[in-house]
Regions:
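Conserved Walker A/P-loop ATP-binding site and its immediately adjacent core
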Residues: 56-76
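Walker B catalytic acidic pair
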Residues: 134-136
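ASCE P-loop NTPase helicase motor core
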Residues: 138-214
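Mg2+-dependent endonuclease catalytic cores in nucleic-acid-processing enzymes, primarily RNase H-like
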Residues: 289-412, 431-434
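Inter-Walker segment of RecA-like/P-loop motor cores
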Residues: 69-127
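Pre-P-loop entry segment of helicase/translocase ATPase cores
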Residues: 1-27
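ATPase catalytic-site recognition across NTP-hydrolyzing enzymes
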Residues: 204-270
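Walker A/P-loop NTP-binding motif
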Residues: 39-53
Length: 438
């Protein structure tokens, strides 16, 4: 005789979500701001539903497979432990699966790098009854998602059983992104339930820490539009200027009440074609991110342009001056992964046995989001020195191309943006150090 499991979910799922969870809709879209607990709610509901059907399987998907372990896999695992049913499961990582020891049904996890592969997925025990597309905005289009979804919804299930699909995401800023236009269409359709939640809907105690709420209020005070997007999940549009220039705080000198914990550099190189720049940035004990120095060489308009070997020597000498001035060696040196940047890297290695770390670039809008996120914390400073004027001027002048704003692929104006790129590579490469990734 199976032991009965008693679960009180009311202590874990905020009342806001009752309507979407108890809805009979087979497609449930949970969107909203960061900290709304929507992903936690879905994971708890999936585990509870899974336990009620001994033949049910769950397929959880992200766009890219290498994001699974530290996101949806751990999220489902967390829900299982929260519900005190971990003794029923075996946790596997190669491939990622969480298997019910009693009957062999499981939570399956997959990237959708190639939707065609999932179309031919076979489940040996039972049937796929629940789907979850997490971070839906990362997918390229609804067609990509629907190709996978339809592969499972078309299959015959026992009487009374249906495939239920969950979708969760934070809305992008751009109203012309496919997902923002798509959701307005889906919420009008029968069989669909669209829910929007924010951190303000988290009414149960001991879920959001006071430190997190303080962080939200800091962002709200520093950049209200960013707060509306990040934490309220509003589609605020892109505007024309990319950064709020007031969030780059000038300093006459390095603060007496703070200390450098680590030094970083960020580089964008164009060599003989366009400008090469490198930034020296400090992370301090008080979590400030301070741009200390800027190297900038622009060959445009010069008759005699520097060769890669000359730029390599410039950088080597400049970096040594920075090390001497600030009394620290660099913790990490980040650079673009473009061909020209590797050319400079090869020159540095040939002359000085030195390599840079070439970042795995994401979409431009995502790299910009990282910087905007950092700026919204109010922790970005720069030394107001002559050499840093090119840095602050380019950040202030950084613009979207107006001809691309009303599209799902907005582009920046690629002029005088080299320090912007260098700063983006540096931030992308150090998200965890800068408290932007947990």
């Amino acid at each position: 005789m199976e032991k009965q499991i008693t679960i009180n979910a009311d202590d874990m799922i905020c009342p806001h979500f009752d309507r979407v969870l108890f809805s009979h809709s087979l497609n449930k879209v949970l969107k909203g701001g960061r900290g709304s607990t929507k992903s936690s709610v879905i994971s708890l509901q999936l585990v509870m539903d899974f336990l009620q059907d001994s033949h049910a399987n769950v397929l959880v998907m992200r766009k890219v497979a290498n994001t699974i372990e530290l996101s949806v896999y751990e999220q489902i695992k967390w829900a299982i432990y929260m519900l005190h049913v971990d003794s029923l499961f075996e946790f596997k990582k190669s491939p990622y699966r969480i298997v019910d020891k009693r009957n062999g049904t499981a939570f399956y996890f997959s990237g959708v790098d190639d939707p065609q592969k999932l179309k031919s997925m076979v489940i040996a025990q039972g049937y796929v009854r629940y789907l979850w597309f997490e971070e839906l905005a990362e997918f390229d289009s609804w067609q990509e998602v629907d190709m996978v979804r339809a592969s499972f919804t078309r299959k015959h299930l026992p009487p009374g059983a249906h495939v239920v699909t969950y979708y969760s995401y934070n809305p992008p800023k751009n109203p012309y992104e496919w997902i923002n236009e798509w959701v307005t269409q889906q919420e009008k359709l029968p069989g669909w339930y669209v829910d929007h939640s924010t951190y303000e809907d988290v009414t149960l105690p001991n879920i959001l820490s006071q430190d997190y709420l303080d962080e939200i209020n800091t962002v709200k005070a520093n950049d209200y539009d960013y707060y509306r997007w990040m934490y309220l999940g509003e589609v605020i549009g892109l505007g024309n200027s990319i950064y709020n220039a007031e969030l780059f705080h000038p300093l006459k000198e390095f603060p007496d009440d703070d200390d450098i914990m680590e030094l970083y550099t960020g580089q964008d190189s164009g060599q003989q074609v366009s400008a090469t720049t490198e930034l020296c940035v400090a992370l301090t004990r008080k979590k400030r991110v301070i741009v200390l120095n800027t190297y900038y060489y622009d060959p445009v308009g010069k008759v005699h342009k520097k060769a890669p070997s000359d730029i390599a020597k410039d950088l080597r000498d400049t970096e040594q001056r920075w090390i001497d001035k600030w009394g620290r060696h660099f913790y990490k040196q980040s650079a673009d992964s473009a061909t020209s940047d590797f050319a400079l890297d090869h020159e540095m290695y040939k002359q000085y046995n030195q390599h840079y770390h070439h970042v795995a670039k994401t979409k431009k809008t995502k790299m910009i989001d990282n910087v905007q996120n950092l700026l919204a914390t109010g922790r970005v400073y720069y030394l107001d020195t002559p050499e840093n004027q090119i840095f602050i001027r380019q950040q202030r002048d950084y613009r979207w191309d107006e001809d691309t704003l009303q599209t799902d692929n907005p582009r920046v104006i690629k002029e005088n943006d080299h320090t912007c790129d260098a700063f983006q590579y540096l931030v992308l490469d150090n998200l965890r150090d800068f408290d932007l990734k947990y």
